[in-house]
Design a protein with these regions (language model features):
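Short beta-strand/turn micro-motifs at beta-sheet edges
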Residues: 1-3, 102-104, 150-157
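Detector for glycine-centered tight turns/loop "hinges" at secondary-structure junctions
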Residues: 60-61, 155
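Short beta-strand-to-turn element immediately C-terminal to the catalytic PLP-Schiff-base lysine
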Residues: 14-16, 57-58, 82, 118
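Internal helix-turn-beta structural module
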Residues: 137-158
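Glycine-rich phosphate-binding loop of ATP-grasp-fold ATP-dependent ligases
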Residues: 1-24, 75-80
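Short beta-strand elements
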Residues: 1-6, 53-57, 63-72, 148-149
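Active-site "cap" helix and flanking loop/linker of ATP-utilizing ligase/carboxylase catalytic domains
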Residues: 29-43, 48-51, 69-138, 152
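Structural motif
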Residues: 12, 63-64, 112-115, 141-144
Length: 158
């Protein structure tokens, strides 16, 4: 079933992605990430930071690059961070010191899903400042992330 809606970056995300096996992860690193970083270095543009590669895996199992960003992807990051058990700040500092390869990254086994709630009409023309009443309360197994929301003068979430 096709979703007929405007397509901003994404309407949701999940982690882990079943298609990203250890073999696929290694393949992406060897065929996409490493050549990208090596290519930047060869052109005198060494890079330290987040390199987000938006990928699609085609029917033949070949990873294809849709986009690169030098930041976390949104909303992809939220489900990923819910699974990260390692200290993100320690990883960032290690990257700055060129010691990221010495860090152990630990993930929990849980599945995490993020769903975007957006105003009617988003991302085109949509009403701003309207009350938001449909966000469920956080529980021990859920977390609410906000983007583009605020409390108005009456403390109503808008």
């Amino acid at each position: 079933m096709a979703i007929k809606a405007p397509t901003p970056a994404a309407w949701g995300a999940y982690s882990p992605a079943p298609i990203v096996t250890d073999e696929m992860s290694l393949r992406v690193m060897q065929e996409i990430i490493r050549p990208t970083v090596d290519g930047m270095a060869a052109e005198g543009a060494s890079y330290t930071g987040f390199l987000y590669a938006g990928l699609m895996i085609d029917a033949a199992g070949t990873p294809k690059v849709l986009e690169y960003n030098c930041r976390f992807g949104d909303p992809e990051t939220q489900p990923i961070m819910m699974r990260l058990q390692s200290d993100l700040v320690a990883h960032c500092l290690a990257a700055l010191e060129q010691k990221l390869d010495q860090q152990l990254t630990i993930w929990n086994d849980k599945v995490s899903v993020g769903v975007v709630l957006a105003a009617n009409g988003y991302p085109d023309q949509y009403a701003k400042g309207e009350a938001i009443n449909s966000i469920p309360a956080e529980t021990s197994s859920s977390k609410v992330f906000h983007a583009g929301t605020r409390f108005d003068s009456t403390q109503q979430l808008v």
